[in-house]
Curated annotation (Swiss-Prot):
Record keywords, A-Z: Cytoplasm, Methyltransferase, rRNA processing, S-adenosyl-L-methionine, Transferase
Lineage per the UniProt record: Bacteria, Bacillati, Cyanobacteriota, Cyanophyceae, Synechococcales
Homology family: Belongs to the methyltransferase superfamily. RsmH family.
Cell compartment(s), UniProt: Cytoplasm
Gene name for this UniProt entry: rsmH
SUPFAM superfamilies per the UniProt record, alphabetical: Putative methyltransferase TM0872, insert domain, S-adenosyl-L-methionine-dependent methyltransferases
Class of this enzyme: transferase
HAMAP family: 16SrRNA_methyltr_H
InterPro entries the UniProt entry points to: RsmH, SAM-dep_MeTrfase_MraW_recog, SAM-dependent_MTases_sf
Protein name, as recorded: Ribosomal RNA small subunit methyltransferase H
Entry-linked Pfam families: Methyltransf_5
Organism, as annotated: Prochlorococcus marinus (strain MIT 9301)
One CC-aspect GO term: cytoplasm
Residues that bind S-adenosyl-L-methionine: G46, G47, H48, D65, F92, D107, Q114
Length: 300
């Protein structure tokens, strides 16, 4: 099922740690000079770029996003800055800039539209197809993934990307369901089946028992870890001397990769020994910000 790009009424994503992102760029020695150029590697709804373009009147930004719905929404949000924003249909790991820039920002979180639109299949709060593709042109969605993987590989995936200790039991149940009943009807049926793998007392906790498995499937479908690894390898080559790279991550796998890169890449100076986290005020206003971690590095 395709997302209707003509309907942007439900795109209401709140950008995370905007103030902290803005402050991170002050490390760049020429941040207040004319002809400033930057890359928003995860444009989303355009929130971070909007605030940056408002603050720096001579700033030009290249905004990258593989999600066509996000790009359409960002175009509307950033219309007043259309002469200074260049929106590209690209995964950040595949992009090759023609010239070096002063900064790169990346927010690795799933945007609220992707979570809240049931047709995207990222969530089980409302029933939808087992999709989970950030780029609808990808060949393999979540439904296809659980079909083609054998039980062992599916269990390993759920454990590695979801840190789910019941991964083997869950994988066994999923493959048994597929064998006996064919495809799942949607996200709710899969979530219900996963919940059945847990003891009754654990099925009704604050965090739904299917949450970790859904995270693992989403990461695998979009190859998020492989893409991030490639991005971290190439992004220093995008920067001018003294340029800033600011990355917000939302789970431990991502944060470990960013931390390791910023600490060990000899091209970079690590500016955050410990990650910057959202303020209590922001978390109160936007619960989805609570697990965000911002790390900053500077090109030597």
């Amino acid at each position: 099922m395709q997302t209707d790009l003509s309907d942007s009424s439900f795109f209401n994503h709140k950008s995370v740690m905007t103030d902290e992102i803005m402050a991170s760029l002050e490390h760049y020695p020429l941040i207040h000079n004319n002809q400033l150029k930057g890359i928003d590697a995860t444009l989303g709804g355009g929130g971070h770029s909007y605030h940056l373009l408002r603050k720096y009147s001579d700033l030009n930004i290249i905004g990258l996003d593989q999600d066509p719905f996000a790009r359409k929404s960002a175009l509307k949000k950033l219309d007043e800055f259309k002469s200074r924003i260049d929106i590209r249909a690209s995964n950040f790991a595949d992009f090759v800039p023609k010239e070096k820039v002063s900064f790169v920002i990346a927010d690795l979180g799933v945007n609220s539209n992707q979570l809240d639109d049931p047709k995207r299949g990222f969530s089980f709060q409302k029933d939808g197809p087992l999709d989970m593709r950030m780029n609808p042109l990808l060949d393999v969605d979540a439904e296809k993934l659980i079909e083609v993987l054998n039980e062992k590989d599916l269990a390993n995936l759920i454990y590695k990307y979801g840190d789910e200790r019941l991964s083997r039991k869950i994988a066994r149940k999923i493959k048994l369901d597929l064998k006996e009943n064919g495809k799942y009807s949607g996200t709710k049926e899969l979530a219900y089946s996963i919940a059945g793998c847990f003891p009754p007392k654990q099925r009704y906790k604050k965090i739904h028992p299917a949450t970790r498995t859904f995270q693992a499937l989403r990461i695998a479908v979009n190859k998020e870890i492989e893409v991030l690894e490639k991005f971290l390898q190439v992004v220093p080559e995008w920067l001018l001397p003294g340029g800033i790279i600011s990355v917000i991550s939302f789970h431990s796998l991502e944060d470990r990769l960013v931390k390791s890169c910023f600490k060990n890449d000899q091209r970079l100076k690590n500016l955050t020994k410990k990650p910057i986290t959202p303020s209590e005020e922001e978390v109160e206003l936007n619960k989805r910000a609570r697990s965000g971690k911002l790390r900053i590095a500077q090109l030597n």
